[in-house]
Amino acid sequence: FVPSILISVSLMAGISSLVLPGDANVFVVPTLQMAFGLCSLILLYFEGIMDDLVGLRYRVKFVIQILCALLIVASGIWLNDFHGLFGLAGLSPWFGVPFSVLLVVFIINAINLIDGIDGLASGLSIVSAFFFGIMFCYEGYWGFAMLAFSLMGTLVPFFYYNVFGDAQKRRKIFMGDTGSQCVGLILSVLAIRLSMTLPDEQPKISGIIIVAFSMLLVPAFDVVRVMIHRFRRHKNVFEADNSHIH
């Protein structure tokens, strides 16, 4: 997924600069966010490869996921406003930064855990990516809109071969931990960035935080339900089982 997404983003950026040379700057993402985000994505990508090939203990995976989340918030992408949700508005960095780290790790694992049947994780992610792309276009954040649509464009052919591919003819592909975790990371970044409030800008959509995270409601609900299910049965909440909604 990561190489395909990087190629898609680069291709779209190149085409946009040729078609709209005067407005090419609107597609630029801040350098710090791009650099830290790319490092986070590559780190999670290699962690996923190692997990798919040899298997990693969940503690090791959590440490790497937390490092990836720290890179994201260090780039300046963290949830700084609840927009009136729970009676809260602007958030202090002392709360917003650690909360954002936990949120990124939560969404990464939510997408990873719901990847249990063909087309489920990729189908939900396609809908979410399309929604984020439209919302970022409406808000005028073209760089993040490009990222969302690139993710969607990468997932659409995968969805076809994952659902309709023939395994006997070697035409069926699977997401694995590598793909699902990277998709979860990108979706978490898109959701948090869409919900952020910048000093000189205000969201055009009222209750933007609810709108942003509503796309991730199904995988989030599954994670919470599964953890409660395991806890009630005195099982390790981080150990895999067959108690998911799928």
Region annotations inferred by a language model:
Residues 1-2, 16, 22-29, 48, ...:
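Membrane-helix boundary/helix-loop-helix interface segments in multi-pass membrane proteins
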